[in-house]
């Protein structure tokens, strides 16, 4: 169903996706390449391209745990070094877009799943996240959510200035940076 992810995935069967994903990740990392699992918390079962609009995953937490999150749990257990956040609306988890959601980035990925590696956003110019927010506010929201790398912020200078202002004002803790 997914217009963008379908051809870039290992399929629809969670066990095959998990096995192929683990083998691919292990091969990359054994070869000295940082593997990146994406698009957390699961972009496969959507019909909307997040480059153009915000996809919605209307599923229950139970469904998310049993299907979408299943391969990510396995990748984390087996030492994946990086996870890319997708721009998704998942009402069962939070009202904010997943890539700028503290409950999803820090609460679910870091605390609940125990991921200790690098978290990167998908491109912050994509309509899935940029439709209703300015570049600088998106960058700040992603940082506050717990993201380590902001991929392709729209206005880089404004984003840097906003993050710097947040650090200087105490809105964000410079020690966390």
Give the ranges of each region predicted by the language model:
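A glycine-rich phosphate/pyrophosphate-binding beta-strand-loop-alpha-helix module
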Residues: 1-11
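Second-shell residues forming the walls of enzyme active-site clefts
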Residues: 12-172
